[in-house]
Amino acid sequence: MIPTYMNIMLAFTISLLGMLTYRSHLVASLLCLEGMMMSLFIMATLIASNTHFPLINIMPIILLVFAACEAAVGLALLISISNTYGLDYIHNLNLLQC
């Protein structure tokens, strides 16, 4: 396997482990999720540049759109939780409460 792909897969794995380890704080979870999305974007860009299939070139752009939407929703949720509770703990997030 090419070392570039291995480094990107290692970055994704480290971000995934960080997501599983630091799941009590929303800021840490959002940063790890953003790291996972960026490593997926780099991997998709490398795959799109190495293959000569023209329809796959749009895949990294679509992935960036989803990453931007995920970041916007995550930051809005962070602001809402920090204004309501004053903390960024995920266990404060309960959607069943009114």
UniProtKB/Swiss-Prot annotation:
Location relative to the cell: Mitochondrion inner membrane
Q: List cellular component terms (GO).
A: mitochondrial inner membrane; respiratory chain complex I
**GO MF term set:** NADH dehydrogenase (ubiquinone) activity
Q: What is its EC number?
A: 7.1.1.2
Question: Would I find Hydrolase among this entry's keywords?
Answer: no
Superkingdom, taxonomy of origin: Eukaryota
> Gene3D superfamilies, per this entry?
1.10.287.3510
Membrane topology term reads: Multi-pass membrane protein
Leading EC class: translocase
Q: Which UniProt keywords apply?
A: Electron transport, Membrane, Mitochondrion, Mitochondrion inner membrane, NAD, Respiratory chain, Translocase, Transmembrane, Transmembrane helix, Transport, Ubiquinone
Where exactly are the transmembrane stretches of this chain?
Answer: 1-21, 27-47, 61-81
Query: Can you list the disulfide-bonded cysteine pairs?
Result: none
Give one Pfam family: Oxidored_q2
GO BP annotations, alphabetical order: ATP synthesis coupled electron transport
Catalyzed reactions: a ubiquinone + NADH + 5 H(+)(in) = a ubiquinol + NAD(+) + 4 H(+)(out)
Name the predominant localization: mitochondrion
Q: Which family does it belong to?
A: Belongs to the complex I subunit 4L family.
Q: What does this protein do?
A: Core subunit of the mitochondrial membrane respiratory chain NADH dehydrogenase (Complex I) which catalyzes electron transfer from NADH through the respiratory chain, using ubiquinone as an electron acceptor. Part of the enzyme membrane arm which is embedded in the lipid bilayer and involved in proton translocation.
Q: How does it assemble?
A: Core subunit of respiratory chain NADH dehydrogenase (Complex I) which is composed of 45 different subunits.
Write the protein's name. NADH-ubiquinone oxidoreductase chain 4L
Q: What is the native source organism of this protein?
A: Macaca hecki
